[in-house]
């Protein structure tokens, strides 16, 4: 799990205004942090297939949110991709 301080940091970095916790950018950034954390977990726990299922769900959810953002706000999408270092 992501630590509370780390979560607050991510929210403050990607929030569009003060108190924004549900914008698409914030959701994608939080999911991305969880995905990176799970990838580190799999380096030492190669046979954890149950968690791998959860990882695939998170990747799918992130992809859907990215597609939505690309469809609605292309400029914000490009900025987010660059900030998070995702390939697209």
From Swiss-Prot:
Cited InterPro entries: Ribosomal_uS15, Ribosomal_uS15_bac-type, uS15_NS1_RNA-bd_sf
GO MF terms, alphabetically ordered: rRNA binding; structural constituent of ribosome
CDD domains with a match to the protein in the record: Ribosomal_S15p_S13e (cd00353)
Key words, A-Z: Ribonucleoprotein, Ribosomal protein, RNA-binding, rRNA-binding
GO cellular component assignments: cytosolic small ribosomal subunit
Pfam families registered for this protein in UniProt: Ribosomal_S15
GO annotation terms (biological process): translation
Gene3D superfamilies in the record: 6.10.250.3130, S15/NS1, RNA-binding
Assembly behavior: Part of the 30S ribosomal subunit. Forms a bridge to the 50S subunit in the 70S ribosome, contacting the 23S rRNA.
Described purpose of this protein according to its UniProt entry: One of the primary rRNA binding proteins, it binds directly to 16S rRNA where it helps nucleate assembly of the platform of the 30S subunit by binding and bridging several RNA helices of the 16S rRNA.
Family from the record: Belongs to the universal ribosomal protein uS15 family.
Protein name as it appears in the record: Small ribosomal subunit protein uS15
